[in-house]
């Protein structure tokens, strides 16, 4: 188990705990709250599995509602830009899923910034740019 303890914890239900904690098992959050009671989890949470985040904020993953991550690549320049099709103003046949480069460093940058879900779509210069895809 992983314990993230002593931070300002905000959850999706509107709670905000000043001395809050998040308890994780594997990749799942199993409990959130305030003033963690170590005696309830004796033997299940060892010292190396505790992150003391005093003075920091702990937030749920953010969702990016409109972006071009992976289709206008940060490092590739024009060669990696699959965002726009300039032949016509209406391009509903374009699918972001077909253009995404999963190796684009923008995915790592988004994750480091706390973004865990991306709505990616083509066409910033078209009236109808194409079909979006949501990636988590």
Where are these regions (language model features)?
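Extreme N-terminal starter segment of soluble prokaryotic enzymes
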Residues: 1-5
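Histidine-rich, glycine-flanked metal-binding segment
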Residues: 9, 13-59
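Short, glycine/charged-enriched secondary-structure capping and boundary segments
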Residues: 18, 77-80, 133-134
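Short secondary-structure capping/turn micro-motifs that flank functional sites
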Residues: 38, 126-128
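Metal-associated gating/positioning segment near the N- to mid-region
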Residues: 56-122, 126
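Mobile "lid/hinge" segments at catalytic clefts and subdomain interfaces of large enzymes
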Residues: 128-136
